[in-house]
């Protein structure tokens, strides 16, 4: 028989009981995590979001409560009233927050039953992710996921407190907006009232937050949902959350200073970690030169080494010809990996090929010197110069790629991260931040044969590079900045264009006709004509930030109801077909291929 609450009020969370509560009468409510019979006594681990409490049913203390406890099974919903007592000698559980106490039950209510579970809720049990997502309401009861989401809530609270304390206003921007596709595809929402027309769900609040700056709200923020209809990867979701900020009458230094304070506050209050301020900075060019990527992981070395000048006249034609053709030769020193087998090196070669490398040359450093198929092609002077550049020692493994600069940097940069993971160099408890600055403003899209924005079309060029936007676009640097943590970009921002003339020029450089720019962005251009202030901002990816704070392997473990890599919610079975009546109201029909 299921009981009603009958006016009972919870006095404590299960996981909040301490030795200071001994002697108190308490009312606890939660789920039966585990039940054990011990010689007439029944022990139940009662669980809620704060943790576990051991409750004891003694037939001598309360026969009625003990009788009810006999029917309790895992995940039954239970309320108990009882007295907090110390655990007997030898039974204290130092691994449990409530491990010094237990509750001797005087009354019990069974508030609901549960079917047999499709999987156990212990954190250490490996369960197929699709099964977990299908029964997400059960999966979310697991302590590790509850801790992740509680921390997520805490980060959002810290963010609001910090930003409002620094003069920011929390303002909302629309979810039903105009489609202005740049990069990823928009999610489209058909309008019932305006047949044949569509809203788009925002990929970011970018345009509206800039218009808020034009409107005089000089410090804005929002913890906001964004949407992108793109092919999904392990760390991407079609809907995601940003901490979105914008400021007026500022420069890059103002934004970076305020945001460093936010990040430091978050890490201090959630991890007890000190973020040393100011956070180090590195230009985009330096990052590419040293690490091959614009989001370097600074927890380990394995820096890339430029070798083009050393090998440009070498007898090894593969290297020399690449340099002569405008390419580069780089390498990295996998310290202590000289004992790798040929198969292991072949696996590294195949990995590098994923990112465009045609091959991976290698040298094993032995007591006799270089051991490599390419050793015979180099002079003693060239070998000595490379040894010095690599700081090569006996037992090291030197790896080389020769190709176009982009291929070399991409493949070696990714290989660097791959090696670090396989060598156990990634400490999840170490947090290494770096600002990457001075990005290129534009990059040439070889497929589309046009210039594309490296960040987005609203990023301002460096003042000293403005004159080159039309004449030499590849030379222009942007007033852009990314915050990188352990190789993950957790925030990206820029100073924005605030003059209509420059914004129109940017659209022109991106291949928009004047008419097309007006159709898509006319409201922004119009706003700029009415006294737009200098402004800039940043957006932090909340999901990825929480993933790093919790040490989670998947972004899906820090989102309450995530989608699969196919964009599906297995629990609610979305997306789904809709009936013809709904389609007719929208003036739509489906086309079956």
From Swiss-Prot:
Reactions the enzyme catalyzes: tRNA(Asx) + L-aspartate + ATP = L-aspartyl-tRNA(Asx) + AMP + diphosphate
NCBIfam families from the UniProt entry: aspS_bact, PRK00476.1
Protein keywords: Aminoacyl-tRNA synthetase, ATP-binding, Cytoplasm, Ligase, Nucleotide-binding, Protein biosynthesis
Record-listed ATP binding positions: 228-230, 237, 489, 541-544
PROSITE patterns registered for this protein in UniProt: AA_TRNA_LIGASE_II
Organism annotation: Geotalea uraniireducens (strain Rf4)
EC number: 6.1.1.23
Protein name as it appears in the record: Aspartate--tRNA(Asp/Asn) ligase
Gene Ontology biological-process entries: aspartyl-tRNA aminoacylation
EC class name: ligase
Keyword presence, Cytoplasm: yes
Location of this chain's protein in the cell: Cytoplasm
Biological role stated in the UniProt entry: Aspartyl-tRNA synthetase with relaxed tRNA specificity since it is able to aspartylate not only its cognate tRNA(Asp) but also tRNA(Asn). Reaction proceeds in two steps: L-aspartate is first activated by ATP to form Asp-AMP and then transferred to the acceptor end of tRNA(Asp/Asn).
Site (Important for tRNA non-discrimination): 38, 90
Gene: aspS
Subunit structure: Homodimer.
Cellular component terms (Gene Ontology): cytoplasm
Keyword Ligase listed: yes
Family to which the UniProt record says this protein belongs: Belongs to the class-II aminoacyl-tRNA synthetase family. Type 1 subfamily.
